[in-house]
Amino acid sequence: MESTDQNNSIPEEFYSFNTGQPFCECSDCGKDLLEPGVVYVIEKAIRQYAGYTAKDVIFEVAICLECVERIKDEISAESMRNMMKFYEEMMMNGAQVEPGDSLTKCAATGTPRKELTNYQINALCNGTELSPLQPPYLISGEVLDEMNDILSDATRDFLDDYQQKFIGPSPEWITDDVPGGRFVLI
């Protein structure tokens, strides 16, 4: 029988690219994220190059749950309905990815990570640990583009403004030829 004392530490691939350390404050409000009981999400968009081991972090963000809720309040009702429908379809028709494989293939399509050019990894965290409520997961850039396509113009504009204000990257990264390079908050 497997031990229930698993290591729930946040994996290093969810550490800040800039510091090599765990995110310590909310990218939006500056709240201390490493306190026990502080729930937050980490979202990183990554571009990898075929035939190379090099990867670029397109953007990374750690946002406390309070700020996530505030961001969700800015999303139009139309976009929320479209996203809920998209998530339901993805869960019903998506790939069956085992929890231990959640970062090795796209949760929606099952496409192996090594075959993807662009993808986002996401984790729900509580202080210095992964939350047991949801395993980390990976979504391909193509699926993120599908999600972006169902957002209203107002929501897309809000998220683009949010990305530029709090996350970056430089505008040349946010182009139509970089799948999954837009902030979607998944």
Regions found by a protein language model. Give the residues of each.
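Compositionally biased, flexible interaction segments
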Residues: 6-7, 17, 21-30, 78-82, ...
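Short Cys/His-rich Zn2+-coordinating modules
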Residues: 2-14, 44-51, 83-95, 122-123
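Short metal-binding segments enriched for Cys and/or His
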Residues: 53-83, 131-159
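Short recognition patches in nucleic-acid-associated and regulatory proteins
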Residues: 20-58, 101-137
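Long, contiguous alpha-helical scaffold regions
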Residues: 88-186
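Phenylalanine-focused residue identity feature
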Residues: 14-17, 23, 59, 86, ...
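N-terminal intrinsically disordered, low-complexity tails enriched in polar/charged
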Residues: 1-22, 54, 183-186
